[in-house]
């Protein structure tokens, strides 16, 4: 019972010294610079070092007033309550029927019936704001929904047909862009935490959520991998009314819909388009959305590029096979524009990077360093490449989904003043990977790409079409290749050059599915799946990217020093299934158990079908 639970929690909290002020209206979040200072209320000002925003559906507009992005929005939500039913047991589990979007539970001797609408309606859509006095507000009951709800309930719970309905309810409930919670410290204000966006399961999650946020505040980080709940997984555009209102009409129903592998959300699309989006579409690209960008997932050869979801064979396998094999044996084009791009410069830039990064950052123009950023416990907070563009000027490249998270981690841990600039939208990035990439680039741009002139992990500017273009000899698939960073306005000029010559070389346009398979074959790791804040570099096979020889200390060094000579508790390895199954039989994704002598010894982190080895492969900690 939510009411009894809330009362008991408040009583227990008061016994521990917590002060609760009722009928206390928030007027303003107080901050000094980008750090929290307190809250101003109608009962006075409370000065404090930390604030946790737990305002439910009001959280977005409270955050907005303080300059903080909180991506949630309320939709109309329905339930009804029957009359008393004397044969109803007092303790019953919550009943869910995903096929009909229906749920039911015991409620004081009555039956409560609700529905997670497959096509939800926004609340307050005219104003985009929740009224301050709407705590117990209701909407006019939609008779069509109520009739449908009653009919569905009667089919699953026949006794409902003979019970009178005492209460019909329609009210607001807030939802997030991906149906996950919003927790942790915000990127905009230091020590301003959030705990909201529970998508209708806040009561059941309250104990664990409160404990987790409290530990997060005390330690400044969490050793658990909570990125899927961290508010910093989102960017500013995710909380814009244009995005959030449309997206939450879909995510509400998705809670009860089939959770298909590789499912792409359909709402709030085309937020960020690649410079050559139309060209890729003509080439057969099937797009998915990542960090707001429409990214080519695969390229259809002769059919309409759309997903047909399945727990077996995937309809994009044939395209991915062609893309993988042609890239391994010849040449593949990959769009990498959504890569996050930060630039750090100033006299303290190198010193600060040495403190932030576990590896020894090269301070030589054109040199690149693969490294991780750690938390004080030695867990991996970020996976990145740092390139020295010139003295005291560096560019950081990291995964698209980690933009807000990594930016926050860097700025929060800087000890000295530097210039930090997010240049993600200023440059596109094209990956040309495969054994013929050197030959292709030489014919296209000139004799700049020989082994001697362009060693591995080096970068340099070339003047192409009256523009400075940065070429970097790196590849996320373990083949010869270059990443090409182009000023966004010049991208189409260079893309046309690549496209024209690509016909001669049988260049394959390749999507994210192929990239994932190719990197997995070479045991290249993906942050958020294979490495997280729960994993340290030693167990992840990344000890080569940790430098204990550099003079500077770095975040997490003390923790690593304590464990570097101790036996590993687990280790990341690449596995393949012994038998050569057909693609999709079985379909491996992630979190599959690894057995030894009939005992589970680990779980996979990334899995896919390798068309080079013709078998299922996976990365797993054992």
Predicted regions located by residue number:
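Conserved positions in beta-strands of structured domains
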Residues: 27-30, 166, 184, 387, ...
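Mid-domain catalytic core of redox enzymes
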Residues: 66, 80-122, 143-144, 151, ...
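Helical element adjacent to the flavin cofactor pocket in flavoenzyme catalytic cores
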Residues: 1-50
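Helix-loop-beta segment of a Rossmann-like dinucleotide-binding subdomain
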Residues: 1-16, 37-38, 128-137, 190-198
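Glycine-rich phosphate/pyrophosphate-binding beta-alpha loops
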Residues: 2, 99-103, 170-176, 192-206, ...
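C-terminal catalytic lobe of FAD-dependent flavoproteins
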Residues: 99, 108, 132, 136-272
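Glycine/proline-enriched, intrinsically flexible loops and inter-domain linkers
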Residues: 224-225, 231-622
């Amino acid at each position: 019972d939510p009411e009894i639970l809330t009362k008991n929690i408040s009583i227990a909290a008061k016994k521990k010294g917590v002060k609760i002020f009722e009928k206390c209206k928030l007027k303003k979040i107080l901050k000094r610079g980008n750090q929290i200072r307190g809250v101003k209320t109608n009962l006075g000002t409370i000065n404090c070092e930390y604030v946790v925003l737990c305002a439910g559906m009001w959280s977005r507009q409270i955050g907005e007033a303080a300059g903080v992005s909180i991506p949630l929005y309320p939709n109309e939500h329905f339930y009804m309550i029957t009359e008393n039913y004397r044969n109803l047991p007092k303790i019953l589990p919550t009943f869910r029927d995903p096929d009909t979007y229906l749920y039911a539970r015991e409620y004081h001797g009555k039956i409560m019936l609700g529905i997670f609408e497959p096509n939800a309606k926004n609340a307050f859509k005219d104003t985009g704001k929740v009224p301050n006095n709407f705590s117990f507000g209701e909407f006019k009951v939609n008779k069509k929904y109520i009739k449908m709800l009653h009919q569905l309930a009667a089919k699953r719970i026949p006794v409902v047909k003979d019970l009178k309905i005492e209460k019909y309810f329609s009210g607001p409930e807030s939802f997030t862009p991906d149906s996950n919670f919003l927790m942790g410290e915000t990127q905009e204000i230091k020590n301003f935490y959030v705990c909201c966006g529970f998508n209708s399961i806040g009561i059941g999650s309250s104990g664990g959520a409160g404990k987790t946020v409290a530990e997060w505040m005390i330690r400044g980080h969490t050793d658990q991998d909570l990125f899927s709940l961290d508010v910093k997984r989102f960017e500013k555009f995710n909380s814009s009314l244009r995005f959030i209102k449309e997206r939450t009409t879909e995510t509400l129903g998705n809670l009860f819909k089939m959770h298909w592998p590789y499912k792409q959300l359909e709402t709030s699309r085309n937020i960020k388009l690649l410079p050559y989006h139309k060209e890729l579409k003509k080439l057969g690209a099937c797009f998915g959305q990542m960090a707001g960008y429409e990214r080519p997932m695969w390229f259809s050869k002769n059919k309409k590029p759309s997903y047909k979801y399945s727990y077996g064979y995937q309809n994009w396998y044939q395209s991915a096979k062609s893309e993988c094999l042609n890239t391994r044996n010849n040449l593949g084009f990959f769009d990498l524009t959504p890569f996050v791009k930060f630039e750090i410069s100033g006299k303290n830039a190198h010193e600060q990077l040495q403190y932030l990064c576990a590896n020894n950052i090269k301070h030589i123009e054109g040199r690149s360093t693969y490294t991780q950023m750690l938390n004080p416990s030695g867990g991996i907070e970020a996976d990145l490449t740092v390139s020295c563009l010139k003295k005291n000027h560096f560019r950081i490249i990291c995964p698209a989904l980690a933009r807000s998270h990594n930016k926050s981690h860097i700025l929060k841990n800087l000890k000295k003043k530097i210039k930090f600039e997010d240049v993600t939208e200023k440059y596109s990035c094209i990956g040309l990977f495969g054994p013929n990439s050197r030959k292709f680039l030489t014919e296209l741009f000139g004799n700049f790409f020989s082994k001697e002139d362009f060693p591995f992990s080096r970068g340099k500017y070339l003047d192409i079409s009256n523009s400075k273009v940065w070429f970097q000899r790196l590849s996320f698939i373990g083949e010869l290749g270059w990443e090409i960073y182009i000023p966004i306005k010049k991208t189409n000029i260079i893309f046309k050059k690549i496209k024209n010559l690509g016909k001669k070389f049988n260049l394959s346009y390749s999507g994210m599915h192929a990239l994932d398979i190719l990197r997995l074959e070479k045991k290249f790791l993906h942050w958020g799946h294979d490495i997280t804040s729960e994993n340290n570099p030693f167990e992840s096979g990344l000890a080569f990217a940790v430098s204990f020889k550099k003079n500077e200390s770095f975040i997490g060094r003390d923790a690593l020093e304590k464990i570097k000579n101790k036996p590993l508790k687990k280790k990341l390895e690449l596995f393949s299934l012994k038998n050569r199954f057909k693609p999709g039989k079985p379909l491996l994704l992630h979190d599959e158990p690894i057995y030894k002598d009939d005992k589970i010894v680990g779980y996979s982190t990334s899995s896919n079908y390798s068309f080079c080895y013709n078998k299922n492969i996976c990365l797993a900690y054992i």
